[in-house]
Amino acid sequence: MDFSIPPTLPLDLQSRLNELIQDYKDENLTRKGYETKRKQLLDKFEISQMRPYTPLRSPNSRKSKHLHRRNTSLASSITSLPNSIDRRHSIYRVTTINSTSANNTPRRRSKRYTASLQSSLPGSSDENGSVKDAVYNPMIPLLPRHTGAENTSSGDSAMTDSLPLILRGRFEHYDGQTAMISINSKGKETFITWDKLYLKAERVAHELNKSHLYKMDKILLWYNKNDVIEFTIALLGCFISGMAAVPVSFETYSLREILEIIKVTNSKFVLISNACHRQLDNLYSSSNHSKVKLVKNDVFQQIKFVKTDDLGTYTKAKKTSPTFDIPNISYIEFTRTPLGRLSGVVMKHNILINQFETMTKILNSRSMPHWKQKSQSIRKPFHKKIMATNSRFVILNSLDPTRSTGLIMGVLFNLFTGNLMISIDSSILQRPGGYENIIDKFRADILLNDQLQLKQVVINYLENPESAFSKKHKIDFSCIKSCLTSCTTIDTDVSEMVVHKWLKNLGCIDAPFCYSPMLTLLDFGGIFISIRDQLGNLENFPIHNSKLRLQNELFINREKLKLNEVECSITAMINSSSSFKDYLKLETFGFPIPDITLCVVNPDTNTLVQDLTVGEIWISSNHITDEFYQMDKVNEFVFKAKLNYSEMFSWAKYEMPTNEKSQAVTEQLDTILNICPANTYFMRTKLMGFVHNGKIYVLSLIEDMFLQNRLIRLPNWAHTSNLLYAKKGNQSAQPKGNTGAESTKAIDISSLSGETSSGYKRVVESHYLQQITETVVRTVNTVFEVAAFELQHHKEEHFLVMVVESSLAKTEEESKNGETTDTTLMKFAETQRNKLETKMNDLTDQIFRILWIFHKIQPMCILVVPRDTLPRRYCSLELANSTVEKKFLNNDLSAQFVKFQFDNVILDFLPHSAYYNESILSEHLSKLRKMALQEEYAMIEPAYRNGGPVKPKLALQCSGVDYRDESVDTRSHTKLTDFKSILEILEWRISNYGNETAFSDGTNTNLVNSSASNDNNVHKKVSWASFGKIVAGFLKKIVGSKIPLKHGDPIIIMCENSVEYVAMIMACLYCNLLVIPLPSVKESVIEEDLKGLVNIIQSYKVKRVFVDAKLHSLLNDNNVVNKCFKKYKSLIPKITVFSKVKTKNALTVSMFKNVLKQKFGAKPGTRIGMTPCVVWVNTEYDVTSNIHVTMTHSSLLNASKIVKETLQLRNNSPLFSICSHTSGLGFMFSCLLGIYTGASTCLFSLTDVLTDPKEFLIGLQNLNVKDLYLKLETLYALLDRASSLIEGFKNKKENINSAKNNTSGSLREDVFKGVRNIMIPFPNRPRIYTIENILKRYSTISLSCTQISYVYQHHFNPLISLRSYLDIPPVDLYLDPFSLREGIIREVNPNDVSAGNYIKIQDSGVVPVCTDVSVVNPETLLPCVDGEFGEIWCCSEANAFDYFVCNSSKNKLYKDPFITEQFKSKMKSEVNNTLSYLRTGDLGFIKNVSCTNSQGEVVNLNLLFVLGSIHESIEILGLTHFVSDLERTVKDVHSDIGSCLIAKAGGLLVCLIRCKERHNPILGNLTTLIVSELLNKHGVILDLCTFVRTKGISPKNSSMIMEVWAKNRASIMQAWFDQKIQIEAQFGINYGENISIYLLSDYEKDNI
């Protein structure tokens, strides 16, 4: 047995060999198994040596067989240690390929057809070499058919006629003949004759001409569908006057869209009907239901409105025979793009005439013998009169006659042909029997309708056939010659019903021939490009199957179609009833219209697809739409597309298997180039289809096509896209339609569909929405429409979202009608909701099953919306799939229910550790990670790369310490560190600098005096001596109290920040009392504040409460506060109002020395340095709100020394105190630092400053204030008020006397210029985006990022690190989120990765003096090396002395062993093992950076980067995520989201969300967006999404909690657990991490 380990092996392989040897020795492996696996490892190493840049697999080869590689780059301008290189042989492979770094996971392109036409590429594909002889066989373009100069117009020179000339002819020869009839929804008929039509049009033209408009000016035609006669008059009036018409109406466009059309076209004239004008006058706002006066709108004020209903006729036109100019542009129709954008289709005269001529030829070619009572041509001459009245055809139009196909083939085609058009309201078709009776009544010859309209008519008829008959009369359809049905795809079921169950049953002669689906391009003005014709001239069209030449139907293989191949089957056609599952029935539109060139193209490459392959249909002709109004770039792309011959010839030359085949393909391409030159312009139709026997078959629009990975079902009924799993014996991987060699070819023929690696293979398939819709609607009776689209995630994922319209879902109005306040009815409503939810669950489960059975697809989620709420395509009843997607992304879908299915996502794409039962900080993974980082670091050493024996070691993450043993007063050079307490320093200041200013109240005196309720004493410029007298006054009050206090008694000082507050603190310290400073209670949350106060009083056994006059007045004079205060008054000890104490000049502190020693002196043996004197209570964060910090005189002095020495505080720079005056750094700025440094301290009450900030801001501007401590919220408030004041001062400067004003009294934009150090505290990661937004919002105020200093503080240390005076802007690091999950710090270049594929952080600065920070693994207690993150440990003199835990339920103090241990932690390493550290519980890392300061000097800094707290990180499948990153992603999803909290509870990843106040938050849609973004950006699946009401926490809890969710995570989660939060809605998404672990372990076990 060979147990040797070759030394040349990489470290990871050496480790794996060791594991193998140990497994064999432990008898976990047989001899044969050991030898086999050893050989595999060594062979793999040899292969990797030949390909040195191939990454190795995961260390756990049984669990992870996927390739994994990262590219990294520096993201910031700073120079950092070069620790980021490719991990080529890294043994630390925690994550599977599902978590590939952002650099290697390109996003899916926005084009919906990307990678969908794989089989059109020549022979490409066969990466595995199974199809060696694939040859590129491009389809031959269909050329125009020359139909000859057939006289189609009975002697008219149609090719040169204009519509106004034709109208004039009809007026002259058919003046009394009815031109058109309009039937509204109520059945009222309105008609007009040719003479009235012409004369009224002339009247409109006259009105336009006299308005001094220019030729081709844009005229808005504002008419509804029922105003078809008035609309036709206005349109023809525009034609006659040479103007360009632009149809608009509220039935088609919103007001915003109409305003946009007016601006784009620069229209100044509107022709409008009376009905539409009344709509304008009675327009109401949808938000506040107030009347909107559009006439006063700036846009409409410049427009002239002319009502055409009352204009009358222009009789002068009878006398003259005018000559008409043929306008180039007839009208501009604004259609909507798939994404909802307006695009103006320019409809030109020659396009319209060609459409009419072509339709005339086609209808004439289809003339049948039973048409003999009609004339030979459908077009009637206009230059002479035909007496026979029955020769006219009756055209019954149910399409919108004011636009698109209804306008072209209805109104204008009727004018061109001289027949009778009857325009009916579309609502008539929805009534049973309505359409049939009108057809029979008017004996309609030609029906013009929409496929979905006709479908509803037939369904109504089949449900109740008697509705189409009456007792006196039988419906007879023998009059129908053609049924022209506008559509883009043919629903074969509808065709079957229309022909055989409607037309034929009701007497239509030759129904299959009459029914003619017409391929119309609604997005391009409604022109038609194909319909079944009998024009012949098909000699140049290719024949694929002569047996199917006369057939209009095809049966094609469904599985081949998924790979874009078209395989027809005659057998399936014969046995159509039994071949439904395997073959798809398609119906053709017919041949292209005669004058166009048509080809099928791969839109990705602009190359011809292989013959009988699906692609985008392109057409070329001089008589089709060729312009969008003022959209040049779009025009270039859409209308001037060219075939990429160079690419095709390149394939022929280089990609063919043999020279003979290459030559054959080249010759074929030469032929195509001759018949279709390279400079031919094509129009992209956005239709996906193919050509067979010269006929067009359309499968869908490009927007209705989506891609899916082929899935196989596992034995446990989960799904995977890994087709290699089929080799394990699972035969469901091969669909029925493909077996054996045929299946292999089907899979391998695509280059882009097959994705193969050493352990993975995927095949991408194309699916078409129409087929999905047909299946679901046919099998689920409550579903009526379906939309489906892919999420814009990484390109290989293809996550599908499906939206269904169902009758189970209620609209918003129906839901509101069901609301009630009656208890019984509410219970009943709740029961009904539960039943509805059960039905919804059953519905979505049924859809999931059906989609798998028939299409082998599994959507990621299904949303259920009410019926008729999804947007429809322009001028169609079909769903606008892309618009649905856009509404989904904008959270505008009224989703009532959503259900997810994630099994294949978990198995195929969810990032997870190979060791998903281990923490990334475990001893095992930490060891592997350090070995990997060490190997990387060693490989970048030049000596190592050159073969030298260098073995450099990675540095440990330690800040180093700058220890200051002493601190000296800047003036007297006295050692401040020799004093034992702050009181001794105070006395020294009083004796040496008694007349210098010590403290000052910053409150505006005027503001104080104006308020009768505030009796606080305001002390301005108090000297040291005067301050001592104030302290002495308070000492007298305490000493002489009738209820005496004794040494160590706890007392509470509760007041605003003021001079008297500081004096009271000092007085109590003199008395050796335990001082508990607390902020004043707030009226808004008085109940919670008083509860907290009573809890502290009872826990500490507080003997006295000292308050100022302002708080005393609030408690006693405010009715609301006093009512609440009386409930707790009995629990509160004596309250002393120290503001009432009078200051006497005769008093000094020294006078009380003996009294204090007698009454408050310590007992013998008491260690003063170990006795707490101050308790800091900080309730800002609920996690630590009940943990109170205790400080001794010694610890207070040490903290003051650190602040002074770090900030280099001097006596000549005044201090401003405004924030957090009762604890931490705020307490030190208020009470200690002024005394310690000798600087004057100005104390401001935050509430007063926010009321009137002028004095505070003027002080900052004019005084030499260098350092300022502000909370982020306070900074925002100050900037907001400063901005308002500066704007006010600017307005005042306009006054003439402003020059005389004192500039020191006015606020300038550089108000913060002198403040070099604005300290913003953060307990974890700095909120950099908030600060950036604040600075951007108030950019008028001069404030740079270098002035703002992040302070990293902890509950037990107010100053662990800071950025003060570094003289460099914050250092940006862009971290790879995929590496961060694994515990590794790896930078990326933000320019190289898409937004969201990095985590941006900034440093928290360097450590202060006398502080040592190390980064330690919290599980192993070993120091972390450079390149990984760990827990931040701090050894500092500023650490808290001790703590108390104040239990709110038991009202007592106690110590927690875990927290106690936290104060005296030691590392297990040999380095620094003698030091005791404070464990912060925060994760971060230290990085050495080189950067250039403002003086141009290069400085090296050990910067601390804080990532987040351990309790705010979560582990999912072995990977670590920071909830702050997840929550930021959720908040960025939609502006509706106000607050968000993510936590892990009971194995579930839970997200609590509070939406901003909005009329109708759409929570089902929002949930899906949240789940999608978390999955996309972080690779996590949310399990439960809960929406709380705006006032979501019950009255028993603080409403303020909801305002600051991030600071009150524990309280909110506890309230949720206790069901005290009112839930708006709750969505279950997945089943938790345990299910994912089960699926993964079961899957990997079977794949071993």
Swiss-Prot record:
SMART domains per the record? DMAP_binding
PANTHER family, per this entry?
DISCO-INTERACTING PROTEIN 2, DISCO-INTERACTING PROTEIN 2 DIP2 -RELATED
- Annotated region Disordered: the residues are 52-73, 96-130
Q: Which terms does the UniProt entry file under GO BP? A: diacylglycerol metabolic process; response to osmotic stress; response to unfolded protein; vacuole fusion
- This protein's UniProt keywords: Glycoprotein, Ligase, Membrane, Mitochondrion, Phosphoprotein, Stress response, Transmembrane, Transmembrane helix, Unfolded protein response, Vacuole
Q: Where is this region: Fatty acyl-AMP ligase-like domain 1?
A: 158-893
User: What does this protein's UniProt record list under function?
Assistant: Homeostatic regulator of a chemically distinct subset of diacylglycerols (DAGs) with C36 chain length that prevents the toxic accumulation of these specific DAGs in the logarithmic growth phase, which otherwise leads to endoplasmic reticulum stress. Maintains the basal level of DAG subspecies by directly facilitating DAG to triacylglycerol (TAG) conversion process, possibly via adenylation activity of its FLD domains. Does not affect the abundant DAG species (representing over 90% of total DAG pool), comprised of C32 and C34 chain lengths. Required for vacuole fusion-mediated osmoadaptation.
> What does the UniProt record report as the effect of altering residue 687 to A in this chain?
Impairs DAG to TAG conversion
| Protein topology in the membrane | Multi-pass membrane protein
Any other noteworthy remark?
Present with 41 molecules/cell in log phase SD medium.
Its protein name is Homeostatic regulator of DAG
Give me the ranges of the annotated region Fatty acyl-AMP ligase-like domain 2: 950-1648
Segments passing through the bilayer: 228-248, 1061-1081, 1224-1244
Q: Say which species the protein is native to.
A: Saccharomyces cerevisiae (strain ATCC 204508 / S288c) (Baker's yeast)
Q: Which residues are glycosylated?
A: 28, 71, 98, 128, 151, 209, 288, 328, 575, 644, 730, 881, 917, 995, 1009, 1198, 1301-1302, 1447, 1472, 1488, 1565, 1597, 1634
Q: Name one GO cellular component term.
A: vacuolar membrane
Q: Which InterPro entries match?
A: AMP-bd_C, AMP-bd_C_sf, AMP-dep_synth/lig_dom, ANL_N_sf, Dip2-like_dom, DMAP1-bd, Mug62_dom
E.C. no: 6.2.-.-
